[in-house]
Curated annotation (Swiss-Prot):
Domain notes: The PRC barrel domain binds ribosomal protein uS19.
Main location: cytoplasm
Residues of the PRC barrel domain: 148-229
Lineage: Bacteria, Pseudomonadati, Pseudomonadota, Betaproteobacteria, Burkholderiales
Family: Belongs to the RimM family.
Protein name: Ribosome maturation factor RimM
Bridged cysteine pairs (disulfide): none
Function: An accessory protein needed during the final step in the assembly of 30S ribosomal subunit, possibly for assembly of the head region. Essential for efficient processing of 16S rRNA. May be needed both before and after RbfA during the maturation of 16S rRNA. It has affinity for free ribosomal 30S subunits but not for 70S ribosomes.
Compartment list: Cytoplasm
Keyword Chaperone: yes
Name of encoding gene: rimM
SUPFAM superfamilies: PRC-barrel domain (SSF50346), Translation proteins (SSF50447)
GO cellular component term, pick one: ribosome
UniProt KW Chaperone keyword: yes
Superkingdom to which the source organism belongs: Bacteria
Length: 229
């Protein structure tokens, strides 16, 4: 979800496409649905469309919608909060079990709190049902552009975090939404009480009072934060 940060906040679009706990969409499918290959008749396959290097998971097919080949999806973020990638992208890659397929989407729109879409070649309810349980990926390059002070979580994960004195604080391992603003979960090497190495953790609010710069080209985030906080 988008960060509703106070002050001159940096905003992080969420959830973090590519690094998140997926919704339990398979449990929403009808009992007995297999996790096998996507029915090749359900979508039109373009052999030239190989799996992209920047593929990011944005949702999953949970059911058929109507009788004309439409599918219902659980998006991993809402519209205006990163879920626009699922609505705007017309090239999808589907994964169900070990099978991966490409699908071109002719239409996609909001329907209540879900997304419904029509993959080209999905002509009836049966072919749509064959896609149930498939995870949906789009290219990171197809994500809608953001304002200068907004960031997709997937682009923040893995960045180094340093303070204004240049002290390394660790790497962003995850982003958390507390309902008010985003929080960086920063991991760093530490030593336990028993003298053994362990992974330490810092939680730093992703708001302007603490985040002074996001330097994606340099692979780092500069914060007003001390190592002993």
């Amino acid at each position: 979800m988008a960060g509703h940060d106070s002050g001159n906040a940096k905003r992080g679009r969420s959830p973090s496409f590519g690094v998140f706990v997926r919704k339990p969409v398979e449990r929403a499918s009808a009992k007995g649905t297999s996790d096998g290959a996507v029915d090749s008749q359900a979508i039109r396959i373009d052999a030239a469309q190989s799996w992209p290097d920047d593929a990011v998971e944005v949702g999953a097919v949970v059911d058929a919608y109507g009788l004309k080949g439409w599918v219902k999806l659980a998006a991993h973020a809402g519209a205006g909060r990163g879920g626009d990638a699922l609505l705007k992208a017309r090239d999808w890659w589907l994964q169900k079990g070990a099978e991966r397929k490409f699908a071109r989407v002719t239409q996609a729109k909001l329907h209540g709190d879900t997304v419904v879409a029509h993959p080209d070649g999905s002509v009836d309810r049966d072919t749509a049902l064959a896609l149930r349980g498939a995870r949906v990926f789009v290219r990171r390059g197809d994500f809608p552009a953001l304002a200068a002070d907004e960031f997709y979580w997937v682009d923040l994960i893995g960045l180094d975090v340093v303070n204004e004195a240049g002290v390394a604080l660790g790497k962003i391992a995850d982003m958390i939404d507390n309902g008010v603003h985003s929080i960086m979960r920063v991991e760093y090497p530490a030593t336990g009480k028993d003298g053994r190495p362990k992974t330490g953790e810092r939680l730093i609010p992703f708001v302007g009072v603490y985040v002074k710069a996001v330097e994606q080209a340099a692979g780092r985030v500069v914060v007003d934060w001390e190592a002993d906080y």
